[in-house]
Design a protein with these regions (language model features):
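Topology signature of small-to-medium multi-pass alpha-helical membrane proteins
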Residues: 2-141
Length: 141
């Protein structure tokens, strides 16, 4: 029981070390690094594999070949948010800016996408982009 309480204490202390929205980003990076990307890389068949880069969908072996790049990015993001590394600013916001661009372009290129859906999705991802850009002082590790 003491070990569980000690673990909860560590998790609680870690949670309060950064803003709640940054914790969500941190835990998303952990999920992508340790759960989704290993599944995607090792278990997902090449025929159904897809990766999005700057709004363009890569499929098959091109997707499989670029998965390690996503893995590295999310792994570095998880480590950077965990330790609040100074190099996370501006790179975290730059990466999210790439996601903003990707969401806009992907919606335009997608047969079911529209200018409205592109604008809405890009606007949604602009929120964490701006928040990360304005968080320079938080990255002090």
């Amino acid at each position: 029981m003491k070990k569980l309480l000690s673990l909860l204490s560590v998790v609680r202390e870690d949670w309060y070390s950064r803003p709640w929205w940054m914790n969500l980003t941190f835990y998303f990076c952990i999920y992508m690094t340790f759960v989704y990307l290993p599944f995607d890389f090792f278990l997902k068949p090449v025929e159904v594999d897809q990766e999005i880069w700057f709004g363009f969908t890569l499929t098959g072996w091109w997707a499989k070949a670029t998965e390690p790049l996503h893995w590295i990015i999310y792994g570095l993001g998880a480590y950077g948010f965990w330790r609040m590394k100074t190099w996370m600013w501006p790179w975290s916001s730059v990466y999210v800016a790439q996601i903003v661009i990707a969401m806009f372009i992907w919606n335009i290129l997608n047969d079911q996408g529209t200018l409205l859906s592109a604008t809405i999705s890009a606007s949604i991802f602009s929120i964490p982009m701006v928040a990360l850009w304005r968080s320079r002082e938080k990255f002090d590790g």
